């Protein structure tokens, strides 16, 4: 029997209500005239007469879609507004839980992305989204989903509302203290995590919560890239670079002390927090799998794909961190043009840099091996390349190096065969390197 379809009450609601005036806020103005045509396929376990359950199904449809659909998003906001109004009447009075308020807030948050390119100010969307969070928290003070959602909205707000308006010459005047804004988000996320663990609600460590951590990761990347020197084909010449404040030997802009992003660029706090919380998220995801008797390395299950994505992201973060000490070791060990090698680079001698790099790459491999799935040749190649990197850090012809290259070769041969030669070039380079070292 096919799952039921129905328009979620959107058409009925649209017929009864006129377009709202400005004082009613963003939510109503975001609704679409086509919302009445919106239908969603419900799972069999969803009650076709339960409008709140239907809203949850519609939200899951939006999140799971390959391409964002503004019509669906407007329909969600329209339906949230209708349900909220109905819940406040004597005739239809009923309680809306934290999940409802979280969906309403996150839908407004997502709507800001659609309007960012068309409007100068997305502030009203984020203001109203956080108002919906506060409304939900007034009824469910420690609801983890609401607290996770609050962090998500803040992590999106910073780049979309604040950083998008900044230039290299911007000063802190006119902007909030970005560190305080982010700290509010960290506090909210940690409170949500603690409550979810305390109440053993491990099902909350899902794709939606991982999107919160992803949004912070994206934000940190934006901050890292802010003021990076553009290539000559983008219209920046040497005189422009000097005027903007680029150092001659550096690729990044030197922000003034009064720039709102200056403190963030100098702090590692948020990068460390992201990794710490991502590791904690992974542990809780694995607890959920254990509690539910789920085999994680099953890519046919959503939790299996999520587990792979989290492990891969952690592995890549350790590899990225290893790049600097690896480069320092290689330069000091093999570059004959470097003078005063005994002074080291960035306070590190060759042996120190190598030890740090080995530790980081070893950590990376542990996570990448967790992300290694039997039906994913790319995951085998990712582990192989990490083993090559680790092998390059060990002494030439050492047992450790040979062991690393051997593990890499086996995986690359397997991946190359499965993909009909996709990794032939990498495999040949490894074999040639092994041959040259003998």
From Swiss-Prot:
Subcellular compartments: Nucleus
Primary location group? nucleus
Q: Which domain of life is it from?
A: Eukaryota
Question: According to the UniProt record, which cysteines are disulfide-bonded?
Answer: none
Any one of the GO BP annotations: regulation of translation
Keywords for this protein: Nucleus, Transcription, Transcription regulation, Translation regulation
InterPro entries for the chain = Nro1/ETT1
- Region annotation (Disordered) maps to 1-41, 230-262
Task: Enumerate composition-biased segments (Acidic residues).
Answer: 234-252
Cellular component (GO) terms are: nucleus
Give the family from UniProt: Belongs to the ETT1 family.
Relate the protein's function as given in its record. Answer: Required for correct translation termination and probably involved in regulation of hypoxic gene expression.
Name the UniProt record assigns to this protein: Enhancer of translation termination 1
Gene encoding the protein: ETT1
């Amino acid at each position: 029997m096919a799952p039921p379809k129905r328009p979620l009450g959107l058409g009925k609601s649209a017929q009864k209500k006129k377009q709202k005036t400005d004082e009613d806020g963003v939510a109503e103005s975001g609704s679409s005239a086509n919302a009445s045509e919106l239908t969603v396929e419900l799972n069999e376990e969803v009650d076709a007469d339960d409008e709140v359950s239907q809203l949850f199904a519609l939200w899951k449809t939006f999140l799971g879609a390959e391409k964002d659909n503004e019509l669906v998003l407007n329909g969600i906001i329209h339906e949230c507004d209708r349900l909220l109004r109905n819940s406040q009447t004597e005739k239809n009075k009923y309680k809306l839980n934290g999940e409802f308020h979280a969906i309403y807030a996150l839908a407004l948050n997502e709507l800001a992305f659609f309007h960012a390119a068309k409007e100068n100010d997305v502030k009203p969307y984020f203001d109203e989204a956080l108002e919906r969070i506060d409304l939900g928290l007034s009824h469910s003070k420690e609801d983890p989903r609401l607290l996770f959602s609050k962090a998500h909205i803040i992590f999106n707000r910073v780049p979309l509302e604040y950083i998008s308006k900044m230039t290299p010459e911007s000063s802190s005047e006119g902007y909030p203290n970005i560190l305080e804004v982010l700290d509010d988000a960290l506090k909210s996320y940690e409170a949500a995590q603690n409550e979810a663990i305390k109440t053993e609600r491990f099902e909350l460590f899902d794709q939606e919560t991982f999107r919160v951590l992803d949004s912070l990761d994206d934000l940190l990347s934006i901050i890292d890239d802010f003021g990076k020197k553009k290539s000559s084909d983008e219209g920046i010449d040497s005189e422009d670079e000097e005027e903007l404040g680029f150092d001659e030997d550096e690729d990044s802009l030197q922000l003034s002390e009064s720039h709102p992003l200056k403190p963030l660029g100098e702090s590692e706090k948020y990068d460390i927090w992201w990794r710490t919380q991502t590791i904690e998220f992974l542990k809780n995801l694995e607890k959920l799998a254990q509690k539910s008797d789920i085999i994680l390395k099953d890519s046919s299950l959503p939790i299996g794909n999520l587990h792979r994505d989290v492990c891969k992201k952690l592995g890549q973060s350790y590899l990225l961190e290893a790049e600097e000490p690896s480069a320092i070791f290689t330069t000091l060990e093999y570059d004959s043009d470097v003078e005063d090698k005994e002074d080291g680079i960035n306070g590190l001698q060759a042996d120190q840099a190598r030890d740090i790099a080995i530790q980081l790459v070893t950590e990376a491999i542990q996570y990448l091996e967790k992300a290694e799935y039997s039906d994913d040749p790319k995951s085998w190649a990712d582990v192989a390349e990490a083993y090559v990197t680790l092998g390059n850090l060990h002494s030439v012809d050492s047992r450790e190096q040979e062991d690393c290259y051997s593990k890499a070769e086996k995986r690359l041969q397997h991946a190359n065969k499965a993909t009909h030669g996709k990794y032939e070039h990498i495999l040949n380079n490894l074999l040639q390197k092994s041959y040259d070292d003998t």
